[in-house]
Amino acid sequence: MADLQTQMKHAVADAAVEQIKDGMVLGLGSGSTAALMIRALGAKLASGELKNIVGVTTSFQGEVLAAELNIPLLSLNAVDRIDLAIDGADEVDPSFQLIKGGGACHVQEKLVAAMADRFVVVVDSTKLVDRLNLDFLLPVEVLPGAWRQIQKTLAAMGGSAELRMAQRKAGPVVTDQGNLVLDVKLEGGITDPASLEKAINNVPGVLENGLFVNLTDEVLVGEISDGVAGVRSLERRLS
């Protein structure tokens, strides 16, 4: 499955780069699929197929990779708008609502997505779900001095929250903003993403949570058919 999943990720990354035009200001996402997209973008810039592109990254991971590939970058504060943002997701529901933040970058990712004229999400088919949070925990970035109190508040809201621990350092994960992450599980999953996003963000000490509500314009889904990787486009229909 790992090889097939990698094929799907490459397929959607390449499809996303096809939407990039000369002169664009691009939001460059984080995570494994977004990294493949950034590499594909770097190759097109190096070959001259794309020109005058400027990127705005959503994480230190993306900043390092873009610099390695000689992709020109600007900070979020240096741009007034973003033409196109491309990013991955941890879960996508049928209404195009997302959970992001598996890489603890969801604060910057949401800022960039909100600024973009168009936000395209790139995922493999395993990320499509009927309901958010049944499998993937909801990340919530919190101030270090308040995490335990916020954990109690989230419990009162029906969520079981655990402090995310680092894998290759002693202690918790620390975000690019210097904060901590609580991973939250709601009994029965998330039935009303819009209301929950606001409710969690209203808790004192919470910086941002990983629910992305009504931000996505298109989802590019990598799929395997007859052993071959392909891409299906899902576009949000505005009512």
Swiss-Prot record:
GO cellular component terms listed in the entry, alphabetical order: cytosol
Gene Ontology terms: biological process: D-ribose metabolic process; pentose-phosphate shunt, non-oxidative branch
Pfam families on file: Rib_5-P_isom_A (PF06026)
SUPFAM superfamilies referenced in this protein's UniProt entry, alphabetically: D-ribose-5-phosphate isomerase (RpiA), lid domain, NagB/RpiA/CoA transferase-like
Keywords: Isomerase
GO molecular function: ribose-5-phosphate isomerase activity
CDD domains membership: RPI_A (cd01398)
InterPro entries listed in its UniProt record: NagB/RpiA_transferase-like, Ribose5P_isomerase_typA_subgr, Ribose5P_isomerase_type_A
Catalytic activity annotation: aldehydo-D-ribose 5-phosphate = D-ribulose 5-phosphate
Active-site positions on this chain: 109
Pathway, per record: Carbohydrate degradation; pentose phosphate pathway; D-ribose 5-phosphate from D-ribulose 5-phosphate (non-oxidative stage): step 1/1
UniProt EC number: 5.3.1.6
Family: Belongs to the ribose 5-phosphate isomerase family.
Assembly notes: Homodimer.
Purpose of the protein: Catalyzes the reversible conversion of ribose-5-phosphate to ribulose 5-phosphate.
Full protein name: Ribose-5-phosphate isomerase A
Organism of this sequence: Synechococcus sp. (strain CC9902)
Lineage, uppermost ranks: Bacteria, Bacillati, Cyanobacteriota, Cyanophyceae, Synechococcales
